[in-house]
């Protein structure tokens, strides 16, 4: 997606070119709501953000001038509540991808608050902005020699019961360990006895998830998975989702013009509009539409052992610009 360009003035007076996206992802690369709420509020006030390419170290800029939607990704947005009024005052649309896992016994998320506190934050956010705007992610589904799919699904169901009425959708993925060598190395260094999901185990988990989804009235979606789980009522997800945007923000003409304001009369027959705005920079099995991510790799201090966005756990730097 080629977004429009504009110019911004930096504090030192320099004029720089900036991309002006309609949809902003904050962020697949780092947990901005958990760690950088003050930074984000300042950037929102300034109207732009700088982003450093991790490979060539070049800084590029993203302007918020035309932004109509922020999609936030977080495991613990407790400190982000003071930012919400600033978004509302600017009439900016937003929703959250809230990852709420239960790996306390395994220590896979060492710097997370206690699970009960995170559940409370989820419920509070849902009451503040509405359950349809807080998408629950149990992501990734992770198994070990001790944590079988059956035990894992017991944890998923426990959370589903606590989140009943506070969300409409459960999104999951199966841990991709061998795909990311740094993740494999980090798990090995942490002495985690991990197991890979085979197609048989994926189907076994999907069967149990189907039961949980029906019991707690949750839409089930898989994220970036090649395996077809539609037989269990599980559709491929679009985390940055034109259908959800259409449902939540139909009164925003700019968003509707971008995604197409009406659904196709015969779904699946004409998806030319979706294909035009699909984010081609993501993995093949990703269904997201185009957005601009404003996070930086190696800036999340939460230390999750399975994280792909930090090269070395515990060695991060603050997000800048």
Segments the model singles out, each with a brief description of its role:
Residues 1-109, 115-131, 311-321:
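Conserved Radical SAM active-site core
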Residues 30, 76, 100-104, 140-142, ...:
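Active-site-proximal loop/turn and secondary-structure-junction residues that shape catalytic pockets
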Residues 104-112, 140-150, 188-198:
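Surface-exposed cleft-lining segments at the edges of enzyme active sites
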Residues 117-184, 208-225:
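Conserved C-terminal portion of the radical SAM core fold
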Residues 200-284:
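A C-terminal junction/extension of Radical SAM enzymes
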Residues 228-240, 302-305, 311-321:
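C-terminal/domain-terminus segments
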Residues 254, 258-265, 296, 312-316, ...:
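Long, low-complexity, charged/polar intrinsically disordered accessory regions
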Residues 283-312:
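Local cysteine-cluster metal-coordination motifs and their immediate loop/turn environment
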């Amino acid at each position: 997606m080629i977004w429009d360009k504009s110019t911004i003035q930096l504090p030192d007076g320099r004029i720089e070119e900036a991309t002006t996206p309609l949809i902003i992802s904050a962020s697949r690369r780092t947990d901005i709501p958990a760690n950088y709420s003050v930074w984000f509020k300042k950037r929102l006030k300034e109207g732009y953000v700088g982003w450093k390419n991790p490979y060539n170290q070049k800084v590029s800029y993203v302007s918020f001038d035309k932004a109509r939607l922020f999609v936030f990704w977080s495991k613990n947005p407790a400190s982000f509540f003071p930012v919400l009024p600033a978004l509302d005052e600017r009439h900016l649309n937003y929703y959250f991808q809230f990852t709420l896992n239960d790996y306390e016994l395994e220590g896979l998320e060492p710097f997370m608050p206690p699970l009960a506190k995170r559940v409370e934050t989820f419920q509070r956010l849902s009451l503040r902005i509405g359950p349809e705007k807080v998408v629950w992610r149990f992501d990734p589904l992770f198994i070990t020699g001790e944590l079988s799919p059956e035990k894992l699904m017991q944890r998923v169901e426990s959370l589903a019961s606590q989140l009943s009425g506070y969300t409409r959708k459960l999104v999951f993925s199966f841990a991709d360990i061998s795909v990311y060598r740094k993740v494999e190395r980090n798990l090995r260094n942490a002495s985690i006895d991990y197991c890979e999901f085979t197609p048989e185990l994926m189907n076994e988990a999907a069967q149990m998830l189907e039961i949980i989804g029906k019991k707690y009235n949750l839409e089930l979606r898989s994220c970036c998975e090649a395996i077809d789980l539609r037989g269990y009522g599980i559709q491929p997800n679009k985390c940055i989702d034109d259908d959800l945007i259409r449902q939540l923000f139909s009164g925003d003409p700019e968003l509707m013009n971008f995604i197409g304001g009406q659904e196709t009369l015969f779904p699946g027959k004409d998806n030319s509009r979706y294909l035009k705005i699909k984010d081609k920079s993501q993995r093949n099995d990703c269904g997201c539409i185009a957005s601009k991510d404003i996070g930086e790799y190696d800036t999340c201090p939460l230390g999750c052992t399975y994280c792909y966005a930090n090269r070395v756990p515990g060695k991060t730097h603050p997000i800048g610009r």
